[in-house]
Amino acid sequence: MTEQTKRTTIVLFSGDYDKAMAAYIIANGAAAYDHEVTIFHTFWGFNALRKEELIPVKKGFLEKMFGKMMPRGADKMGLSKMNFAGMGPKMIKNVMKKHNVLTLPQLIEMAQEQGVKLVACTMTMDLLGLQEKELLDDIDYAGVAAYLADAEEGSVNLFI
């Protein structure tokens, strides 16, 4: 009996720290169990892929506004519940540190080290005015058709 390749795909739509944490915890767990894993980042899920530093790029007015409204980098994302004007993320990160839980940036780095394929949705990049140099290095760029091709082969497909 031949062993079939196990595939996990995750659409990360949410821009919330806790939901992105869940996506990356699942991705790292699946990769540890020898799954081929793809995380397809779209809309607010792009917050996890943005570089923290300001990258000078030429943009129109609306694209500049999106850039200012979206958190720059995974560590700047808010919580889905109990954000408390930014105090919630500080509190949960403090609790995570006490319990030796990896931060979202560390989980992203671990995922890349394990070969998890991080994909940025090119249509969303166009809509939000994001450019490749504003995003993390070593990620892929593709449209929804590429995600669907991966998902069609997936044994686990999640939307977060």
Curated annotation (Swiss-Prot):
Pfam families: DrsE_2. InterPro entries: DsrE2-like, DsrEFH-like. This is Uncharacterized protein YrkE. It comes from Bacillus subtilis (strain 168). The lineage of its organism: Bacteria, Bacillati, Bacillota, Bacilli, Bacillales. The gene is yrkE.
